[in-house]
Design a protein with these regions (language model features):
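Mobile "lid/hinge" segments at catalytic clefts and subdomain interfaces of large enzymes
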Residues: 1-12, 19, 35-37, 57-121, ...
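Glycine-/charge-enriched secondary-structure boundary and capping motifs
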Residues: 19-33, 37, 42, 46-59, ...
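Short, contiguous, pocket-lining structural segments
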Residues: 121-124, 145
């Protein structure tokens, strides 16, 4: 259960009107979100004049949250638990790619607006996820954030050594938008078959959009039956860079 947030707001030269405008809009956005979500700001820090060679950094507000687990027996994490469980995506996917990791890292596109935030859906989806966790109905949960759906699924597989089989959505969107878009207020949940009906009932009663996107399986990270990787290969790729980085810097 979220209790409060803190922040560190990192910006360039505030003597530049554009930079000061970014800072002011950031504060306004935080204010609106915190008031709606009932998250008090208990502390914070501001850092200006950040840049290199007279070039300002991108506006970088960093938010840290603190929460309370009232019953640790009902807590969960983002590791898949069992082969054959259903995987459900909570929240609507619109395929927003601007300001995404995919656009910046793979396409070198850095402009464009961030994804729209619907505070009503954000609050409702988050509170419903919390309710399902408290009722011990979810095997695992992961928010969809940096990197989009595909990265969150990969993290869950790598952490647990359990694969996935992802099916085609009923309304197939652009594959890059679907898997790499960073639309807000979304969660991946893993559910035992015998708990699915009750989970579905609560989601419908709470007016939460959801779609079944696949199942957990042994060994392979599989998309539509067309693209397939061994989970241990993904693990090796995920850990290899750090070993090579250490070797190069030591």
């Amino acid at each position: 259960k979220p209790l409060a947030i803190t922040n560190c707001l990192n910006f360039g030269n505030p003597e530049n009107e554009e930079i000061m405008g970014e800072f002011a809009e950031t504060i306004q956005g935080m204010k609106e979100a915190c008031e709606y979500l009932d998250f008090p700001v208990v502390s914070g820090n501001v850092s200006f004049y950040n840049g290199t060679n007279k070039k300002n950094i991108f506006p970088t507000p960093v938010i840290g949250g603190i929460g309370l687990i009232e019953n640790v027996k009902c807590s969960t994490n983002n590791n898949f638990k069992k082969i054959g469980n259903r995987i459900i995506l909570i929240g609507k996917t619109f395929g927003h790619l601007y300001q995404s990791a995919f656009f910046s890292e793979c396409c070198e596109i850095y402009d464009g607006p961030p994804p729209e935030v619907n505070l009503k859906n954000e609050k409702n989806n988050g509170e419903t996820i919390l309710k399902l966790i408290e009722k011990d109905l979810l095997s695992s949960v992961h928010d969809v954030s940096s990197g989009g759906l595909i990265m969150s699924l990969a993290e869950m597989s790598i952490n647990s050594s359990i694969g996935v089989h992802i099916i085609k959505p009923k309304k197939l969107k652009n594959i890059f938008e679907y898997f790499f878009g960073e639309d807000q207020g979304r969660y991946i949940v893993e559910i035992d078959d015998d708990k699915f009906d009750l989970v579905e009932k609560i989601l419908k009663e709470s007016n939460v959009f959801y779609e079944i996107i696949g199942k957990t399986q042994k060994d392979f990270f599989e998309i539509y039956g067309e693209t397939k990787f061994k989970v241990n290969e993904l693990y090796n790729i995920n850990t290899k860079w750090y070993k090579e980085y250490n070797a190069a810097t030591n």
